[in-house]
From Swiss-Prot:
Gene3D superfamilies reported in the protein's UniProt record: Ribosomal protein L11, C-terminal domain (1.10.10.250), Ribosomal protein L11/L12, N-terminal domain (3.30.1550.10)
Superkingdom as given in the UniProt entry: Bacteria
Subunit and interaction comment: Part of the ribosomal stalk of the 50S ribosomal subunit. Interacts with L10 and the large rRNA to form the base of the stalk. L10 forms an elongated spine to which L12 dimers bind in a sequential fashion forming a multimeric L10(L12)X complex.
Lineage: Bacteria, Pseudomonadati, Pseudomonadota, Gammaproteobacteria, environmental samples
Record organism: Gamma-proteobacterium EBAC31A08
SUPFAM superfamilies referenced in this protein's UniProt entry, alphabetically: Ribosomal L11/L12e N-terminal domain, Ribosomal protein L11, C-terminal domain
GO terms, biological process: translation
Transmembrane segments: none
UniProt-recorded name of the protein: Large ribosomal subunit protein uL11
Length: 142
């Protein structure tokens, strides 16, 4: 018989940086999960990722207080900022541009994000990433 799901948590945690302090500790403590078990498991699974890169994680908590988690790929906005070497996107994306992305750079990001994107092929994934870039005030070269 399958375990009964009690709760689903979605958090963004830096790779290799899960610790019991906020926001991780309080979120897990509220649902009764052993915080250190999660932190150790998450840090072990993300040690190959770039240190400090924020990773979305979906934690499924069961009624017996056990848990499973799925680590997703970094957000597209974080990958775009990393490639361009900027701290944040534009405050006025329609007027003030903060950088420019080529098709090749968009394809690199799309290939990295492909498992988490809702697209059938790489061209559709590139368009999704291009939309994110435009909303950040980044010029897109398609």
């Amino acid at each position: 018989m399958a375990k009964k799901v009690a709760n689903i948590l979605k958090l963004q945690i830096p790779a290799g940086g899960a610790n019991p302090s906020p926001p991780v500790g309080p979120a897990l403590g509220q649902v009764g999960v052993n915080i250190m078990d999660f932190c150790n498991a998450f840090n072990a699974e993300t040690q190959s990722a770039e240190k400090g890169m924020p990773l979305p994680v979906v934690i499924t908590v069961y009624e017996d207080k056990s848990f499973t988690f799925v680590v997703k790929t970094p957000p597209a906005a974080v990958l775009i900022r990393k490639i361009l070497g900027i701290a944040k996107g534009s405050g006025e994306p329609n007027r003030e541009k903060v950088g420019k992305l080529t098709r090749a750079q968009l394809e690199d990001i799309a290939k990295q994000k492909e498992p988490d994107l809702n697209s059938n092929d790489i061209d559709a994934a590139v368009l999704i990433i291009a939309g994110t870039a435009r909303s950040m005030g980044v010029e897109v070269d398609l």
